[in-house]
């Protein structure tokens, strides 16, 4: 069967993706819009490749994703206001703040009135690294009931600005979460043994397994 699922990102062709950078009103960012443009688009980024390079190689040149990165959008609220479960509220507020500056129709690649994909970077580190309930765990999910300028905003992925030791987030986490946007499932033990068993998954050999953490740049 085809991998394509309802409202997912196209799996072949040259397409546009939007990356939204979100900051809080009481925090400062370490990395710039240009830094994330390199992470997403620069050929041979950091010696191993960018997000674009990864999906070009994995698709044997059939999927070419050009990412437009917004400037940092500073929210009205403090970090603690949104908390670890505030991703949808953050995204909604940030998109509303810049809706006059960006045309979401550019990122509806198939013209069906739905934004094909939205990749979000939030200031700071992710809960998967800090263990803090104040931080957001990187994930892929869906927004219900948000339409901006006639375009429905549904699927999104969200990742942190920093990975560890104040290093910029690696492409592995971004590629992993975006894999869900293409219709790919997780291939690791998603409940970490709480159901009474453990699943080794596909390990470091698969971006949807442990491969998102391979090396300094994922």
Residue ranges and their predicted role:
Residues 1-153:
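Zymogen propeptides/activation segments of proteases
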Residues 117-119, 123-218:
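Extracellular hydrolytic enzyme modules, especially secreted metalloproteases
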């Amino acid at each position: 069967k085809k991998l394509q699922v309802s409202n997912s990102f196209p799996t072949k062709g040259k397409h546009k993706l939007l990356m939204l950078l979100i900051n809080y009103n009481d925090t400062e960012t370490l990395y710039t819009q240009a830094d994330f443009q390199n992470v997403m688009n620069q050929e041979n980024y950091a010696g191993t490749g960018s997000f674009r390079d990864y999906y070009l190689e994995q698709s044997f040149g059939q999927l070419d994703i050009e990412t437009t990165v917004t400037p940092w959008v500073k929210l009205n609220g403090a970090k603690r206001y949104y908390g670890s479960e505030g991703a949808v509220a953050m995204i909604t507020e940030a998109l509303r703040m810049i809706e006059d500056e960006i045309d979401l129709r550019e990122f509806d690649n198939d013209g069906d009135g739905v934004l094909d994909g939205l990749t979000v970077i939030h200031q700071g580190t992710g809960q998967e690294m800090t263990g803090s309930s104040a931080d957001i765990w990187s994930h892929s999910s869906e927004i219900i009931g948000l339409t901006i300028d006639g375009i429905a905003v549904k699927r999104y992925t969200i990742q942190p600005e920093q990975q560890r030791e104040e290093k910029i987030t690696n492409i592995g986490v971004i590629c992993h979460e975006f894999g869900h946007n293409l219709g790919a499932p997780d291939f690791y033990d998603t409940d970490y043994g709480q159901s009474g068993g453990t699943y080794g998954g596909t390990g470091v050999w698969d971006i949807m397994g442990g491969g998102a953490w391979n090396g300094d740049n994922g």
